[in-house]
Amino acid sequence: MKKIFFIFFLIWTSLSVNAGVFDKKNAFLKAEQAFVFTESQQNDRLSLNWDIASGYYLYKKSLEIKGENGQLFIPQLPLAEIHQDDFFGDVEIYRHQLTFSLPFTQLSATKQVEITYQGCTEGFCYPPETRVIALTSLERESGQISSAVLKEESVLSELPLAEQDRLAAKLIESKYAVFWFFLFGLGLAFTPCVLPMLPLLSAIVIGREQRPSTAKAFGLSVVYVQGMALTYTLLGLIVAAIGLPFQVALQSPYVLLTLSAIFVLLALSMFGLFTLQLPVSLQTKLTQYSQQQKSGVFGGVFVMGMIAGLVASPCTSAPLSGALLYVAQSGDLFTGAITLYLLALGMGLPLIFITVFGNNILPKSGNWMIQVKNAFGFVLLALPIFLISRVFPEIEMPLWFSLAFAFSLWLLYQFRNNKGVWVFTFILGVMGYLYYSYAMNRHTPAHQTTSLSQFERITSYAQLQQVLSKNPNSLAMLDLYADWCVACKEFETHTFSDVAVQKAFTDVLLLQVDMTKNSEANRELMQKLHVIGLPTLIFFNQQGQEIEGSRITGFMQASPFVDWLQKMKSIQPISQ
């Protein structure tokens, strides 16, 4: 068993070490070298030119020219080439060179234009590039851009992406992104939301009067994983297509509390307090039906796999968020289904290995199984604590401490004749108590109340624009919050209440929108800001404009969040 875990550990760590296969920094040109941009203003026209390196191309649909007030200018573009893209299908592109011009009469309502474009090459895509051109001189030298603009672009280029955005970008860059989802799934298999599923599957396969054969154990585990894979595939497609309304239903406190109650019952049954079973009469009928149709047991395992997929979904981590973001950006439902299926298959592979190999390694049934069953009960109790704490964060630490204390007492009883275990457990208990005391003092309700009181509530997009216009010299952060959003509560409890974060907030305008009711004003604001789900944090500069590449669309711990804020602030002194 240890060898199996070691193999999976090597696979996951090698994936992290070799993450550079996505970048290929030495194999590709820098964006400014691949797409050499120049501009000139003469003869009452603004001329734009891109010299495109061999093997590289620009997307026609990515070209966008905006004025300082956000108005769009539509240029007359030359005929584009049709290209079969790995992710977007048939797209129009430009190779070698792109040149066009705009008359100043068309640009008379603005003093500057913002030009956005994006290019790719085989197996690699660049993030969108933006150039700002001031229209103050008709004889401006070709390619000249203000130092302030260059400085801002330099700062933005160094800005770290959020974890889910960084993952999505790497996946889109990779030609074989679909297959990488399988490896990411292996990593997700060891997250707190998936790990508790291991004893549940073991109970299905091993916890029978007669242990199933290796072939049947393999079959049960595969069917279980297929049920989980189906759930994740459908979940990903629904989230990508619907967004917020589905999040509302799935992350509702009622759903989380119901799931928690189910796992508490399962844990109590594993402690032997009672046996969960159907009435004898119904069991007899089901047994007869099962004998007539051999797939009955497998069908039940398939349904349990689907349920396991739903249980894990509220605890979506950054890699899964990146996967969903990738599906949303690809726009291809078939590709999205395949990628998320492989993600779930990777998550289920460790379950299959543990079930099959564990079935042969474990000794015959005996008293040891009672101890294992009780231990699994403690593991099952961890998941409801994890879920309940997202609805009632103030009781998270007391619940974890209570579970750890109960497990320690049980462990000491099992090894009551082993002094070494007593000493080791005592040391762990002292360390756990010290950490508990520290955590309780660090995240008190007073701290949380203070952090929330700093936010100014926004109810509409119009009000947001008005507030931003009255604070032109402040960095503003907009927090899209909802009571049903469990990750939003994590931000409040673990991030916003942190002392270092509170200190970093001193010169930041803090705004918050309550999206709980999903009202018409909420939907309008989401549409205007292009928000697909919660939590979402958006940063605005001193002009009230969103800072490009600065969004946070998933939970972030306090330390990296402080670094993020410092990066945002480093952009603010720039004046154009």
From Swiss-Prot:
The gene is dsbD. GO terms for molecular function: electron transfer activity; protein-disulfide reductase [NAD(P)H] activity. Its main location: membrane. It comes from the Bacteria. Residues 20-177, 251-253, 317-336, 389-394, 441-576 are periplasmic. InterPro entries: Cyt_c_assmbl_TM_dom, DsbD_gamma, DsbDN, DsbDN_sf, Thiol_diS_interchange_DbsD, Thioredoxin-like_sf, Thioredoxin_CS, Thioredoxin_domain. Belongs to the thioredoxin family. DsbD subfamily. Residues 433-570 form the Thioredoxin domain. It comes from Pasteurella multocida (strain Pm70). It is an enzyme of class 1 (oxidoreductase). The lineage of its organism: Bacteria, Pseudomonadati, Pseudomonadota, Gammaproteobacteria, Pasteurellales. GO terms for biological process: cell redox homeostasis; cytochrome complex assembly. This is Thiol:disulfide interchange protein DsbD.
